[in-house]
A protein has these predicted regions:
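A short glycine/serine-rich beta->alpha loop
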Residues: 12, 68-76, 210-219
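Short, conserved active-site loops that position catalytic residues or coordinate cofactors/metal ions
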Residues: 18-24, 80
C-alpha cells in the first residue's frame, strides 16, 4: 500500500491548538481526483491541500501546483489553505522568501517574513446579486436597516457573496439562515458562500460562512 506524508497546519493561530486547522499533502502527484476527495472527506477539515510538481499553466514559474478540497468538492482557490500550503513547502524546501504557487484559478505570489506570510494575486470579477434588501436581511437574521441595500458577488478565484453590515455589533449578531442562503445562491447560480464585513476606518472585520454537509459553518 502506498503511504503519503501529510502535515496539519493551524492557520491564523496564536497557539499550537488554535487557528484554522488544515491538512497538507506535500507529494500528491500519484493521487487521483477520487482519492483526494475521499481523503478530504476522511479528514473532515474545512479544507485539505494537495501539492504537485509545478507545471507551466498560467504562464508563471511556480514552485508547486496545488489543489484544494473541502469534504464535498474542490475549490479553485481559497486563502487559508494557500497560506498553510505556502508555509509547509517553504519549510520543506527551504525556499527564498518570495515564490509563486499555482492554484487551479490563478498564480498566487507568496511573501514570507519570519512566521508571517502574505499572499497577493491579480484580477477579479464583480456583479450584483439578484437578492432584494429584504431577502438579504432574512439570510443574516438582521433587520434591513442593519445591512447595505445590495450584495455583490466577488470572484478572485472563488465566488463569494459580499454583504456590508452597518455596525460591528450587528456583524457579530448575525445568525445565518441556511435555507435562505441556499435559495439566493441558487438564484445567482453560485455556491453558498457568504462574506459579511464591516469597516471601521482602516480596520475591516469579517465573518465567512459556507454550507458543508448540509450545515452552515463559519471559517
Amino acid at each position: 500500500m502506498q503511504t503519503y506524508t501529510y502535515h496539519i497546519v493551524n492557520v491564523f493561530a496564536d497557539n499550537h491548538f488554535g487557528g484554522n486547522p488544515l491538512a497538507v499533502f506535500p507529494n500528491a502527484d500519484d493521487l487521483t481526483d477520487q482519492q483526494m476527495q475521499a481523503i478530504a472527506q476522511q479528514f473532515n477539515l474545512s479544507e485539505t491541500v494537495f501539492l504537485f510538481a509545478p507545471t507551466a499553466k498560467h504562464g508563471v514559474q511556480a514552485v508547486a501546483d496545488l489543489r484544494i478540497f473541502t469534504p464535498n468538492y474542490e475549490m479553485p482557490l481559497a486563502g487559508h489553505p494557500t497560506l498553510g500550503a505556502a508555509f509547509v513547502i517553504q519549510q520543506l524546501q527551504n525556499l527564498l522568501n518570495n515564490f509563486v504557487l499555482n492554484t487551479i484559478a490563478k498564480p498566487v505570489e507568496v511573501q514570507v517574513n519570519d512566521s508571517h506570510i502574505e499572499l497577493s494575486l491579480t484580477g477579479f470579477e464583480q456583479r450584483i446579486s439578484v437578492a432584494t434588501h429584504e431577502e438579504l436581511a432574512k439570510i443574516t437574521g438582521l433587520m434591513a436597516d442593519d445591512i447595505a441595500n445590495q450584495a455583490y458577488w466577488m470572484n478572485t478565484g472563488t465566488s463569494q457573496l459580499l454583504l456590508n453590515v452597518l455596525s460591528k455589533q450587528k456583524l457579530y449578531d448575525a445568525k445565518i439562515n441556511k435555507e435562505q442562503l441556499q435559495t439566493i445562491c441558487q438564484k445567482d447560480n453560485e455556491l453558498a458562500m457568504l462574506y459579511l464585513w464591516y469597516q471601521d476606518h482602516d480596520d475591516v472585520f469579517v465573518r465567512f460562512f459556507s454550507i458543508e454537509n448540509n450545515q452552515v459553518v463559519q471559517d
